[in-house]
From Swiss-Prot:
Residues 239-263, 271-281, 332-348, 524-545, 567-589 have a biased composition (Basic and acidic residues). This is Myosin phosphatase Rho-interacting protein. The keyword Isomerase does not apply. Residues 824-879 are annotated as: Interaction with PPP1R12A. It comes from Homo sapiens (Human). Targets myosin phosphatase to the actin cytoskeleton. Required for the regulation of the actin cytoskeleton by RhoA and ROCK1. Depletion leads to an increased number of stress fibers in smooth muscle cells through stabilization of actin fibers by phosphorylated myosin. Overexpression of MRIP as well as its F-actin-binding region leads to disassembly of stress fibers in neuronal cells. Residues 43-150, 387-483 form the PH domain. Residues 2-383 are annotated as: Interaction with F-actin. GO terms for molecular function: actin filament binding; cadherin binding. Residues 152-302, 317-383, 485-545, 560-591 are annotated as: Disordered. Its main location: cytoplasm. GO terms for cellular component: actin cytoskeleton; cytosol; focal adhesion.
């Protein structure tokens, strides 16, 4: 039993010091959460809104930096899964999951993204970029997420403890993993038999750990084959089974975290997707020594896999290369692009010896024979279950159309399926498919994922895989179970191999996506072979190994190969494209027309013409073997050679005739008409011969089918590739004819269906139009009835509600009249206030005019005083400067007195002038005050007048509206509108009243004060004088 079942603690609580261990039992979290139900019950420990960079964003590209980030709600669970969804509702399915148990580091992403508060979560699969709104949020997330890479790095340094094996019999999964680990790891101190996987998560981790251990020391290429060790069991496994395991091994080599990885999606298998492999191969360092394409083991695997390709042609969808003469051109490209790189690791482990001589130079290498015999000797020692072992998740369709996911295990000519891998350990079988009765496995289009069907005598079983690569691997593996490969008898196939080495044609491998980019830089010869493959991509993309090529293309390919020079040391030219053949034919027709135009004489038909018709371009035939008697294969070769060369007469004998005729010494020449008739006869004869040859071809095809049927049951030698190709070409012709018949029948059915569809559509359109017209008429009648009914109901309701409306209108009229009276009263008050303000304004204006008059008087008086002062000053000056003799004779006392009086008088005049200035300034201030008062009064008057005008207009509108409502009400009641009901307007002139007060007190007081002041000043001046 697994450790997870023995663990009584089912609830994981992180330890304070080690987050990957349980607080209760101190066991890893993988031993607690075993199924999806436990995953959904996990407790969230942190969450919040974050911004996620879109998938596939390359921040090194400036265009991608402007992409809009996606706002998602992130939740971190206690088992280490970071999930994000569109909202925070717990019922919302997450859009994605980041397994923090595989996280290698969490770093600041501002340098990469150019965005503040961003983080980069590094995992072996990809990089995830998240961003927060503030620094506090991103700091909290960084603190929570950094626990996982730190724990992973700590666990990397610790050596894992492996549980001892249980005494029960190990299942197929255990046998496969232990055997592969024992063959691939020789330097490990822990015995590989003890590495028994316990659960779904530990199985994957143990598989990766066994792949992580270093391989055996590779032998140098210079060592002889006798010194090399026999290949291990893992190296003898089929390439289709081994490729996925090596891919997972390569990915485990590059994993930074050493803790056990838990599969979150529940889909556990030894396969990986193409995207994962592509990313891993970019990180994988180049191999130390590339394998030589001409090693014996490589050639042995090529020849053996040709038998597999013949048996599982519909499943593999590819074409294998024959053993070519050139060592650089016979490199097998593999059955899919994903195996190109892992196969190199196989060859490095198998220690390739020195390169062998060319296959065309020597019929068969002794090393090759030794390797084949070595394989025969080592294969029985290998457990068949290990060679054919495969397991993984697939979905099965039941009879009711329901799909259910199962854990499938392929071994011992049966395909068993369980509920999950734990059920496999417990031998809890859900069902089994017997592959001994299986005769075919084909791809089948389904709605879910990538489907395929297993055809057995009992029935058909429909399954589906997650990816096309997984489906292809399953089909290939199942087909190998259906048609197991047997080691050929090398001794009995030596002469046939000689024939094959001299006349083999180069077939076209199936092109794979991005294969050339992954294989590194090839040598120049390999580049040329790839260029030939790229020229053939037009055909190879259209036709696979299971999709037969048309027989015309096969004949054209072999014809082009036969016409060329018979050089067996070079691969023959690939088949010409249809466009090139058309251009060649058009060119020949043009040359024929020109040469016929040059013929101006006729030449009688004779023996030369008969000999001429027999001149054809013959390509060198296939060399016959003198070592064996003529068997069925030799006869087929001869017949095919006749079929290949016969269609060339029709095109190639015509250009020879003008050349031959032009070499005549000016004799009689054929006319154009006679030459045309001869050519037509010759064409008919050629067609007759071609029909006879086609009949013979059909007979030979029947013989070939019988021979292939005999050889299928007990095949002990190599099969000539050219023979197989021709057999497939014949089957391809019949298949093409059937397809054409089916297409024509399908086209006829489509035309019938289109006509039926058009007829039904026309009938349906006519019926729809008539139904629409009937519905329109019915709708119109119904509308008319509804309108009459509604009018009657409205009239009755109006008659019943007229009295109520009349009372309501009267009440509203009375209320409006009351409001109007209130408004008129307010209006009269406003008018009265306006009149008072107007009177006050008039009084202010009068006071202003009075002030202006007083100001003028004061200005005149001031002018008079100034004049008097000037006269007095001049008089004083004349007194001071008038009589010099009098001054000399006068007494000093009189002079001093006069000077004092003059000073006093001058001071008095100055003080009077100062007072007058003050008076003028005070008058100016009063004038400005009066002007401000006037402006304020006029503004207030305007505002009040505007308000009164608005109120009057509003009242008039209300009165007119109420009159109209009243008139409408009286008309509805059937009464005449009351002419006497008129509301008298308010006369603004009537409300004006002359006020009996005037603001004259202030002006009188100021005027009296001014008079008093002016009198006192005049008296003082007169006294001083």
């Amino acid at each position: 039993m697994s450790a997870a079942k023995e663990n009584p603690c089912r609830k994981f609580q992180a330890n304070i010091f080690n987050k990957s261990k349980c607080q209760n039992c101190f066991k890893p979290r993988e031993s607690h959460l075993l199924n999806d139900e436990d995953l959904t019950q996990a407790k969230p420990i942190y969450g919040g809104w974050l911004l996620l960079a879109p998938d596939g964003t390359d921040f090194d590209n400036p265009v991608h930096r402007s992409r809009k980030w996606q706002r998602r709600f992130f939740i971190l669970y206690e088992h280490g899964l970071l999930r994000y969804a569109l909202d925070e509702m717990p019922t919302t399915l997450p859009q994605g999951t980041i397994n923090m148990n595989q996280c290698t580091d969490v770093v600041d992403g501002e340098g990469r993204t150019g965005q503040k508060f961003s983080l980069c979560i590094l995992t072996p699969e990809k990089e995830h970029f998240i961003r927060a709104e503030t620094k506090e949020i991103v700091s909290g997330w960084l603190e929570m997420l950094m626990v996982y890479p730190r724990t992973n790095k700590q666990n990397q340094k610790k050596k894992r403890k492996v549980e001892p094996p249980t005494p029960q019999e190990p299942g197929p999964a255990k046998v496969a993993v232990t055997s592969s680990s024992s063959s691939s790891s020789s330097s490990s101190s822990i015995p590989s038999a003890e590495k028994v996987p316990t659960t779904k998560s530990t199985l994957w981790q143990e598989e990766m750990r066994t792949k992580d251990q270093p391989d055996g020391s590779s032998l140098s290429p210079a060592q002889s084959p006798s010194q090399s060790q026999p290949p291990a069991a893992s190296s003898l496994r089929e390439p289709g089974l081994e490729s996925k395991e090596e891919e997972s091994a390569m990915s485990s080599d590059r994993m930074d975290c050493g803790r056990k990885v838990r599969v979150e999606s529940g889909y556990f298998s030894l396969e990986k997707t193409k995207q994962d492999l592509k990313a891993e191969e970019q990180q994988l360092p180049p191999p130390l020594s590339p394998p030589s394409p001409s090693t014996p083991n490589h050639r042995r695997s090529q020849v053996i896999e040709k038998f597999e390709a013949l048996d599982i042609e519909k499943a593999e969808h590819m074409e294998t290369n024959a053993v070519g003469p050139s060592p650089s051109s016979d490199t097998r490209q593999g059955r899919s692009e994903k195996r190109a790189f892992p196969r190199k690791r196989d060859f490095t482990n198998e220690a390739p010896p020195a390169p062998l001589p060319d296959a065309s130079a020597s019929p068969l290498s002794p090393h090759r024979r030794a390797k084949s015999l070595d394989r025969r000797s080592t294969e029985p020692s290998v457990t068949p279950d290990l060679l054919n072992f495969k397991k993984g998740w697939l979905t099965k369709q039941y009879e009711d159309g329901q799909w259910k996911k199962h854990w499938f295990v392929l071994a011992d000519q049966s395909l068993r399926y369980y509920r999950d891998s734990v059920a496999e350990e417990a031998a809890d079988l859900d069902g089994e498919i017997d592959l001994s009765a299986c005769y075919d496995v084909t791809e089948y289009p389904v709605q879910r994922n990538y489907g395929f069907q297993i055809h057995t005598k009992e029935g058909e079983f429909t399954l589906s895989a997650m990816t096309s690569g997984i489906r292809r691997n399953w089909i290939q593996t199942i087909m190998k179970h259906v048609h197991p490969t047997t080691a050929p008898d090398v001794t009995s196939s030596l002469p046939e191999e000689k024939n094959k080495s001299s006349c083999s044609f180069e077939t076209c491998p199936r092109p794979t996506e991005k294969q050339e980019a992954e294989l590194g830089e090839p040598d120049p010869e390999q580049k040329r072979s790839r260029a030939r493959e790229r020229r053939r991509e037009g055909r190879s993309k259209t036709f696979d190994w299971a999709e037969f090529r048309p027989i015309q293309q096969a004949l054209a390919q072999e014809r082009v190969g036969g016409v060329g020079p018979a050089d067996t040391h070079e691969p023959l030219r690939p088949e010409a494209e249809p466009g090139e053949l058309e251009r060649e034919r058009a060119r020949r027709r043009e040359e024929r027309r020109k040469r016929f135009g040059m013929l101006d004489a006729t030449d009688g038909p004779g023996t030369e013409d008969a000999a001429l018709r027999m001149e054809v371009d013959r390509s060198p035939g296939l060399p016959m073997s003198d070592l064996k008697t003529h068997n069925v294969h030799v006869e087929i070769e001869q017949r095919w050679h006749q079929v290949e060369t016969t269609p060339l007469r029709e095109e190639k004998q015509v250009p020879i005739a003008p050349v031959h005729l032009s070499s005549e010494d000016g004799g009689d020449r054929l006319s154009t008409h006679e030459l045309t008739s001869l050519l037509e006869k010759e064409l008919e004869q050629s067609q007759k011969e071609a029909s006879d040859l086609l009949e013979q071809n059909r007979l030979l095809q029947d013989q070939l089918r019988v021979a292939l049927g005999r050889e299928q049951s007990a095949r002990e030698g190599y099969v000539l590739q050219a023979t197989c190709e021709r057999g497939f070409a014949a089957m391809e012709e019949t298949h093409q004819k059937k397809i054409e018949d089916l297409q024509r029948q399908h086209q006829r059915e489509l035309e019938k269906l289109r006509e039926e569809k058009d007829r039904l559509l026309a009938e349906e359109t006519a019926a729809t139009i008539s139904a629409i017209e009937a519905m329109k008429n019915a709708h119109r009648e119904e509308m008319e009835r509804e309108l009459e009914k509604s009018q009657r109901s409205q009239i009755s309701s109006v008659n019943s509600d007229v009295e109520a409306l009349r009372r309501q209108y009267l009440e509203e009229l009375q209320s409006v009249q009351r409001e109007l009276e209130v408004l008129s009263e307010q209006y009269s008050q406003k008018c009265l206030e306006n009149a008072h303000l107007a009177q006050a304004l008039e009084a202010e204006r009068q006071a202003l005019r009075q002030c202006q008059r007083e100001n003028q008087e004061l200005n005149a008086h001031n002018q008079e005083l100034n004049n008097r002062l000037a006269a007095e000053i001049t008089r004083l000056r004349t007194l001071l400067t008038g009589d010099g003799g009098g001054e000399a004779t006068g007494s000093p006392l009189a002079q001093g007195k006069d000077a004092y009086e003059l000073e006093v008088l001058l001071r008095v005049k100055e003080s009077e002038i100062q007072y007058l200035k003050q008076e003028i300034s005070s008058l100016k201030d009063e004038l400005q005050t009066a002007l401000r008062d006037k402006k304020y009064a006029s503004d207030k008057y305007k505002d009040i007048y505007t308000e009164l005008s608005i109120a009057k207009a509003k009242a008039d509108c209300d009165i007119s509206r109420l009159k109209e409502q009243l008139k409408a009400a009286t008309e509805a009641l059937g009464e005449k509108s009351p002419d006497s009901a008129t509301v008298s307007g308010y006369d603004i002139m009537k409300s004006k009243s002359n006020p009996d007060f005037l603001k004259k007190d202030r002006s009188c007081v100021t005027r009296q004060l001014r008079n008093i002041r002016s009198k006192s000043v005049i008296e003082q001046v007169s006294w001083d004088t």
